[in-house]
């Protein structure tokens, strides 16, 4: 699958507008975020599910009271069931309908670059932390993708950089592990998330990086 340096591919979901572009190098700054498109030893693409949804986290950060929630109905479909129950418990008026009990906040594994570490050292550290030390890195791919995500709900733009990461563990190895990380609740195969809004662009990212090893 070819993907030139000048080519930009755009995906849109109900919540996001995502630009994917191949670049030569990852810039180093205090705000650089890097992510790993992890592939198991038996060839499965991995994805993380956040413990808390971005929507619920944003609501909590904007509250001035412990007892009152002010929530846009547009956010409700992007929250976990237990988060919706907490909102419902605090409602003074209105109701919550059309709850999706199967919602998951899918994310690529990775995080913010520390100024004293290399890109690969950052990814090794993040994967170790987010998997509770269950994931170890075999090798990294050579292709780098720049991901520019426009969040239509919060009117914010996020930039991250992604590369393939081939790990030593199989999907079976990871399926029997429990994760207690504060951010990640589960690591699973992207193939199990075909009905998720993010599946199309995430699978595109993996296909580009895997086929460019």
Curated annotation (Swiss-Prot):
Annotated residues for binding of N(7)-methyl-GTP: 16, 50, 151
Magnesium as UniProt keyword: yes
Pfam family membership, one: NUDIX
UniProt-listed InterPro entries: NUDIX_hydrolase-like_dom_sf, NUDIX_hydrolase_dom, Viral_VD9
Residue span of motif Nudix box: 111-132
Binding site for Mg(2+): 126, 130, 183
Keywords, sorted A to Z: Hydrolase, Magnesium, Manganese, Metal-binding
Gene Ontology MF, one: metal ion binding
Transmembrane stretches, start-end: none
Catalytic activity: a 5'-end (N(7)-methyl 5'-triphosphoguanosine)-guanosine in mRNA + H2O = a 5'-end phospho-guanosine in mRNA + N(7)-methyl-GDP + 2 H(+)
Cofactor: Mg(2+); Mn(2+)
SUPFAM superfamilies in the cross-refs: Nudix
Domain (Nudix hydrolase): residue spans on this chain: 30-209
Family in the record: Belongs to the Nudix hydrolase family.
Subunit structure of this chain's protein: Interacts with the late transcription elongation factor VLTF-4/OPG110. Interacts with the late transcription factors VLTF-1.
Function of the protein: Acts with RNA polymerase to initiate transcription from late gene promoters.
Official protein name in the record: mRNA-decapping protein OPG121
Organism: Monkeypox virus
